[in-house]
Amino acid sequence: MTGYTMLRNGGVGNGGQTCMLRWSNRIRLTWLSFTLFIILVFFPLIAHYYLTTLDEADEAGKRIFGPRAGSELCEVKHVLDLCRIRESVSEELLQLEAKRQELNSEIAKLNLKIEACKKSIENAKQDLLQLKNVISQTEHSYKELMAQNQPKLSLPIRLLPEKDDAGLPPPKVTRGCRLHNCFDYSRCPLTSGFPVYVYDSDQFAFGSYLDPLVKQAFQATVRANVYVTENAAIACLYVVLVGEMQEPTVLRPADLEKQLFSLPHWRTDGHNHVIINLSRKSDTQNLLYNVSTGRHVAQSTFYAAQYRAGFDLVVSPLVHAMSEPNFMEIPPQVPVKRKYLFTFQGEKIESLRSSLQEARSFEEEMEGDPPADYDDRIIATLKAVQDSKLDQVLVEFTCKNQPKPSLPTEWALCGEREDRLELLKLSTFALIITPGDPHLLISSGCATRLFEALEVGAVPVVLGEQVQLPYHDMLQWNEAALVVPKPRVTEVHFLLRSLSDSDLLAMRRQGRFLWETYFSTADSIFNTVLAMIRTRIQIPAAPIREEVAAEIPHRSGKAAGTDPNMADNGDLDLGPVETEPPYASPKYLRNFTLTVTDCYRGWNSAPGPFHLFPHTPFDPVLPSEAKFLGSGTGFRPIGGGAGGSGKEFQAALGGNVQREQFTVVMLTYEREEVLMNSLERLNGLPYLNKVVVVWNSPKLPSEDLLWPDIGVPIMVVRTEKNSLNNRFLPWNEIETEAILSIDDDAHLRHDEIMFGFRVWREARDRIVGFPGRYHAWDIPHQSWLYNSNYSCELSMVLTGAAFFHKYYAYLYSYVMPQAIRDMVDEYINCEDIAMNFLVSHITRKPPIKVTSRWTFRCPGCPQALSHDDSHFHERHKCINFFVKVYGYMPLLYTQFRVDSVLFKTRLPHDKTKCFKFI
């Protein structure tokens, strides 16, 4: 019962709990439903209300983000007042901002005015400084002019001799003839120009006996000679050709003497006559041996009893009469060592009597001791050297065929000329054994051997010190040949082996120069004969001709603009502005010193003694103190001699030579716009004398083309043909020594040009410029290549932007082999390479590169020829052809470039640099 009751109670209790749970669940569900109803009904209404209120607030300029309390609604009016205040402040801020911007604009304008004023002040200071420099320079020039005590020299004015002269009979003994007693100086004033009258051999009996080739070659060279005149009355010198005679004709000395005495201008004594006997064969007769005239004799064979030192002339034989050597047939000078160390071919003529010997008097035969005959010792020694096999030599003392006719005791030539030349091309040295007769000073056979050795680059070794080599009065034969006494024949082998390659090549190169200049053609022989006599009587050479410029009329007046690419050189000017007219370099200051004091250098270095130049880059330089102690005319030392940094440096040229200017030579071809831009860039360039524009186009400039006014004359020169050689013609309008050759599309800053000019003044004999190139060895093909890649070595400076001396323009146009200029015209290329070859050949120095420029870029310029691939192939060919013409590679390498002295040097605040960017 109790258990039942408990169960029941428990059941009743559990049921109550269940009912309570159900009731609470219903309440929760009802509350949740009510809550959801409230949210779903009232929230959209509230949101709609506030959204509509927000729109109204926005329209009133208010932003309402939610419901406000009752107290806040009272403050709406205050908020509106604050908003109005904010709007007012914003308007004031906008007005203040506008005023601030106006003030900033005014400040910027004022700053610009300040900068302009500062710039104008600086310009005024620069102008003042330049004016002070000009005043100083003018005062200096005035003082120099007032203190000048030496007349200004120029091209000599010709003073001609009178028609009649008193005559000058020779001394009783014709062997005593010398210039002082057998030459009439009154007919040859120093400024006479050395007029020469040449007899026409066809008008005289002896002319019919002359060798036709000799006569024809002689007449051709006479027609082209600048000294020859047809007016015998004003002549200083009279020339008559008497040989070589045709075989077998032999004119007796008495007959020839009689014919010479009957010459129309002989004037009873024949003073100032030169009798020329040119040789073509080794057995040429000594036609003038017993002809007693007492006058100059020029021939290739002389006996001691006949030759008068300082009066007669030993000349080269006339081997061939071509106008210019065929450079393709001449072997190269390198390699230095050839197959044979030395060679000799010849056969001794044993006969001691001949028609020539019989003509000698008995007293002459008996004079002195009998000659020592070294020929047997020479033969034995040379054969021993050949048999020793120490060096490969070739000596033959018997001709395979009949030897050439020769004089007694002389070594006759063997074989034909072509065969002898082929052997000499394989020979490092060529032995020349002088005749055994000590009275025979020189013979045609020896002179022919010398000619052939020099022609092919075999260094002559002359055994016999008594020999008188051609033109020995002026030529320093020790630079091109070895003259060894015959008693030293046993030491010849040792002597030849001891020569270094550099010495040997220097002798070979000098021998080539002597052969080309004095031996190779009929022109060179005749010019040398006249030059020898002219030098002896101290008359200067004829002035070298200048190219007369045909000016193209053009309109100028266009104001030159300023180039934004021009570098500012800081507070330094680049030189004084020249207010006086452009001044030319002085000319012909050394008319007579070149002939008197410097004649040996002129005779033994290119181009020889045949021209008088207005100036050369080799003129002597005064010591530094001379400019302050009486020889200061024309000098402008820096700081008056005290030196200085940038400002003092830019105020004067300084250096080791007098003040000077330079001429710009600009080659152009149908690029008018590019040309005008380039000319404008030259505006205001200090020390610029003139601009010569070489108009290379057949079309004239446009008639409406207005040329810029750059402060100096612009001369537009018309050329006869389109040739790159025109760039280097020595135009008469170029009045300065310094030439800046520049392409019409080259961009150079003023400071770069001025620095290049200053460097050139210290290296006047070299090319000084900007773009560098070099020659590279092509190993597979064993030839040369033109290379424009960046390199630490260079050997050329392109003349599209380079300084050089006008002297080289003369050499390029009138002295350099014509074959080189012809190739330049053929390819329309390589003229810059040719100029580098020429200068290095003359000086044996490389060019000088200035600044870091390697090339030039011309944006907007028409395509240049240098961009074509064939351009480089042609330049390869040019280099190798030029090497053949010169016989060797004259270009030399250099491994440095030049910058200004104080470049990248830390300076005190009171010092300035020479150039800002260089």
Swiss-Prot record:
GO terms for biological process: heparan sulfate proteoglycan biosynthetic process; negative regulation of cytokine production involved in inflammatory response; negative regulation of inflammatory response; negative regulation of inflammatory response to wounding; negative regulation of keratinocyte differentiation; positive regulation of detection of glucose; positive regulation of keratinocyte proliferation; positive regulation of phosphatidylinositol 3-kinase/protein kinase B signal transduction. Its EC number is 2.4.1.223. The active site is at D832. GO terms for molecular function: glucuronyl-galactosyl-proteoglycan 4-alpha-N-acetylglucosaminyltransferase activity; glycosyltransferase activity; metal ion binding; protein-hormone receptor activity. It catalyses: 3-O-(beta-D-GlcA-(1->3)-beta-D-Gal-(1->3)-beta-D-Gal-(1->4)-beta-D-Xyl)-L-seryl-[protein] + UDP-N-acetyl-alpha-D-glucosamine = 3-O-(alpha-D-GlcNAc-(1->4)-beta-D-GlcA-(1->3)-beta-D-Gal-(1->3)-beta-D-Gal-(1->4)-beta-D-Xyl)-L-seryl-[protein] + UDP + H(+). InterPro entries: Exostosin, Exostosin_GT47, GT64_dom, Nucleotide-diphossugar_trans. Disruption phenotype: Embryonically lethal at 9 days post-coitum (dpc). Embryos are defective in heparan sulfate (HS) synthesis. Conditional knockout in pancreatic islet beta-cells results in a lack of HS in pancreatic islet beta-cells. Abnormal pancreatic islet morphology with reduced beta-cell proliferation and glucose intolerance due to defective insulin secretion. One of its GO terms (cellular component) is nucleus. Glycans are attached at N290, N591, N789. It comes from the Eukaryota. The record marks N277 as: Not glycosylated. Residues 52-918 are lumenal. UDP-N-acetyl-alpha-D-glucosamine binds at L667, R671, N696, N722, R727, D743, D744, D745, E831, D832, R875. Pathway: Glycan metabolism; heparan sulfate biosynthesis. Mn(2+) binds at D745. Its cofactor is Mn(2+). The chain crosses the membrane at residues 31-51. Glycosyltransferase which regulates the biosynthesis of heparan sulfate (HS). Initiates HS synthesis by transferring the first N-acetyl-alpha-D-glucosamine (alpha-GlcNAc) residue (GlcNAcT-I activity) to the tetrasaccharide linker (GlcA-Gal-Gal-Xyl-)Ser core linker. May also transfer alpha-GlcNAc residues during HS elongation (GlcNAcT-II activity). Lacks glucuronyl transferase II (GlcAT-II) activity. Important for both skeletal development and hematopoiesis, through the formation of HS proteoglycans (HSPGs). Receptor for REG3A, REG3B and REG3G, induces the activation of downstream signaling pathways such as PI3K-AKT or RAS-RAF-MEK-ERK signaling pathway. Required for the function of REG3A in regulating keratinocyte proliferation and differentiation. Required for the inhibition of skin inflammation mediated by REG3A through the activation of PI3K-AKT-STAT3 pathway. Required for the function of REG3A and REG3G in glucose tolerance in pancreas. Homodimer; disulfide-linked. Interacts with REG3A. Belongs to the glycosyltransferase 47 family. This is Exostosin-like 3.
